[in-house]
From Swiss-Prot:
Protein name in the entry: Homoserine O-acetyltransferase
NCBIfam families associated with the record: metA (TIGR01001)
Site entry: Important for acyl-CoA specificity: 111
Catalytic reaction equation(s): L-homoserine + acetyl-CoA = O-acetyl-L-homoserine + CoA
């Protein structure tokens, strides 16, 4: 089933070329069906790339989704045209009196700062509080997951000696949780971060359940009570070449960055990346949408 997005959103062309089913709002309004209202709080500077990554995954389900893109009013985005934000994005003030079936909070390149040093932290806290009573389920990704774990449960993040960068094998730790329905016992997911949350801290919070982790990359998937909050420390939404672009960007900046682990064939950056996370990335998002959003949300929000 399709996702409903603005007909002029640049990501629309990318998705259509990949045979992702998209629909205009005008067409959707003629169908006698309630689409799920999904908000994406896009904290990434690469807004259009992140839009395509997430829409690609949530569009690959049998559900009709009405997608609302959000940006932070208290932060000036320097890497995206203001015209793009004005045309396709809303702020929290625009939607704070509405309810949503699902909310996705993305990562952000601010993890070396303390949470309180982030210029939009107060606004983000208001959004996370809002989500507790106005959203059926919220999926937090990477720094967004760290922020959610810290705000809701007091879980700290810790700096890493070296950037966790690459594609890592993870093990399922809970066998009978719907979020992991259809998962293999071992699966891969990309990580790209300078900080971590620790398994001992997660296990120390009785409301949280550790679902999957990696011997090398640490905590990946965590879930809160009744699936109202889901936390993914990795980047299952990443495109094939996202880590490659990050690696080349940092090299061009003169940063001392290692080749992303387990990513390029033969670990050679001159060869093609090996994509080993796509199927489980699709499964993660479809399970979240089906079991924790669609199956749980009321017909009338």
């Amino acid at each position: 089933m399709p996702i409903i997005i603005d007909k002029d959103l640049p990501a629309r062309k990318v998705l259509q070329e990949e045979n992702i089913f998209v629909m205009t709002k005008e067409r959707a309004e003629t169908q006698d069906i309630r689409a799920l209202k999904i908000a994406i709080l896009n904290l990434m500077p690469t807004k259009q790339e992140t839009e395509a990554q997430l829409l690609r995954l949530i569009g690959n389900t049998p559900l009709q989704l009405d997608v609302h893109l959000l940006h932070m009013e208290s932060h000036l985005s320097r890497n995206v045209a203001q015209e793009h934000l004005t045309s396709f994005y809303k702020t929290f003030r625009d939607i704070e009196n509405e309810k949503f079936d699902g909310l996705i909070i993305t990562g952000a390149p601010v993890e070396t700062l303390s949470f309180e040093e982030v210029d939009y932290w107060e606004e983000l806290k208001r959004i996370m509080e809002y989500s507790k009573t106005n959203v059926t389920s919220t999926l937090h990704i990477c720094w967004g997951a760290q922020a959610g774990l810290y705000h809701h449960y007091g879980v700290q993040k810790y700096p890493l000696k070296e950037k966790m960068f690459g594609v890592f094998e993870h093990e399922v730790r809970e066998q009978h949780v719907k979020l992991l329905q259809g998962f293999d016992e071992l699966f891969f997911a990309p990580h790209s971060r300078h900080t971590e949350v620790r398994e001992s801290d997660i296990r120390g919070v009785k409301e949280l359940t550790l679902l999957a982790n990696s011997e090398e990359a640490g905590v990946h998937l965590v879930i809160g009570p009744e699936g109202r909050q889901v936390f993914a420390l990795g980047h299952s939404e990443y495109s094939c070449d996202t880590l490659k672009q990050e690696y080349e960007r940092d090299r061009q900046k003169g940063l001392n960055i290692d080749v992303p682990k387990n990513y390029f064939k033969h670990n050679n950056p001159n060869e093609k990346p090996l994509v080993r996370w796509r199927s489980h990335g699709n499964l993660l998002f479809s399970n979240w949408l089906n079991y924790y959003v669609y199956q749980e949300t009321p017909y009338v929000l």
